[in-house]
Design a protein with these regions (language model features):
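N-terminal signal peptide c-region/cleavage motif recognized by signal peptidases
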Residues: 19-21
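Conserved HGGG/HGGXW glycine-rich cap/lid loop of the alpha/beta-hydrolase fold
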Residues: 52-101, 292
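Bacterial N-terminal signal peptides
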Residues: 9-17
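Short strand-coil-strand connectors
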Residues: 42-44, 65
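Flexible "cap/lid" subdomain of the alpha/beta-hydrolase fold that forms the substrate-access gate
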Residues: 25-37, 45-48, 53, 60, ...
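Bacterial N-terminal signal peptides that target proteins for export
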Residues: 1-9
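Catalytic active-site module of serine/aspartate enzymes centered on a nucleophile-bearing elbow/loop
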Residues: 299-323
Length: 323
């Protein structure tokens, strides 16, 4: 889930990348309007909706959103990076925004490796060989998986809440009671009542998750509504239910992803240069940094921000965190 941390993530991503160009900044382009001009491209099973801003020759940066958010999480940070010479790609994940499945016959599958392969397919479609990755929540997990399975495609990584790769076997194991409570929605989605409830109350549900994950963030209706529209995607509910049910071992994935999931079940190390970040007031379920530090075996740093930093704070903090 997105936050002040995610702004920090992008700033730190820059520090892992190449030296920034001032070309775009000097040109004085207004990249902010790009979020009103979403592009579409066929990539694998999907017709992907994505924002693509900044000079085409710039270092590619891929920013991945989480649930239940969307590309507008990066509506201010992406233009800031583009103005510094980066080519910034912000795709809508499957089940969000204008991204659509090309075939009606394709399962509305939300398993983690499928989402990671979507991003690799998008890179291929855009002829991007390697990119800097940053993400939070589903986006961080997706970026982690790309880094683990296709390290040659990842120049560097910034992951909010660190190492989020898991497996169905792990997901089946009970957690301490306090941890189980944080995952209440996952268990809700496992029931017919939860499926019906999320479909009926998607926006209200998302607003509740935003508030629980980010207790100090007083987001406006305008900010929420900009992202909530993406949840009206016709496949959003199915993909969401699939994702959380798959994690608990209640649904099988597609066979074409079996080899990826088998490798991920070994909890592979991530070897690319990485910075993980966390905040002191993150209301979303998240692992302790010490628990995953050893999974990053390349150049690695962890940054913990202050007690007032929660899991979703306004874009007003951008100026302090993008360098």
């Amino acid at each position: 889930m997105f936050n002040k941390l995610a702004y920090s993530a992008v700033a730190l991503t820059v520090s892992l990348g190449t030296v920034m160009s001032c070309q775009a900044e000097a040109m004085g382009k207004d990249y902010a309007s790009a979020f009103n001009q979403v592009k579409q491209i066929n990539a694998g099973d999907l017709n992907v909706g994505y924002v693509d801003i900044g000079p085409k020759e710039g270092q590619p940066v891929i920013l991945l959103h989480g649930w239940p958010y969307d590309i507008h999480s990066y509506a201010e940070v992406a233009p800031a990076l583009a103005a510094k010479g980066y080519r910034v790609i912000v795709p809508s994940l499957r089940g969000y925004g204008t991204t659509r499945f090309i075939s009606d016959k394709t399962p509305r599958n939300g398993q983690p490796s499928a989402m990671a392969k979507d991003i690799v397919n998008l890179m291929d479609a855009l002829n991007i060989k390697q990119a800097v990755f940053a993400g939070y929540d589903w986006g961080a997990r997706t970026a982690d998986i790309v880094a683990a399975l296709w390290p040659e495609r990842v120049k560097s990584l910034v992951s909010v809440s660190g190492y989020l790769i898991s497996s169905q076997a792990i997901g089946k194991q009970p957690l301490p009671p306090k941890a189980e409570v944080q995952w209440w929605y996952q268990f809700y989605f496992a029931t017919p009542r939860g499926a019906e409830g999320y479909a009926k109350n998607t926006h209200d549900f998302a607003r509740l998750i935003w508030s629980q994950a980010s207790p100090d963030w007083k987001f406006s209706d305008a900010t929420f509504n900009a992202s909530a529209k993406s949840l009206d995607n016709p496949d959003h509910v199915a993909v969401t239910l699939s994702n959380y049910r798959w994690r608990l071992g209640l649904e099988k994935g597609e066979p074409k992803y079996d080899a990826y999931e088998q490798k991920l079940a070994t909890l592979p190390n991530i070897t690319v240069p990485t910075i993980t970040i966390e905040g002191g007031n993150n209301g979303a379920p998240h692992p302790a940094p010490a628990a995953y530090a050893g999974k990053f075996t390349g150049k690695y740093e962890h940054r913990t921000f202050g007690a007032t930093v929660d899991n979703n704070q306004p874009q007003a903090y951008l100026q302090d965190y993008v360098i």
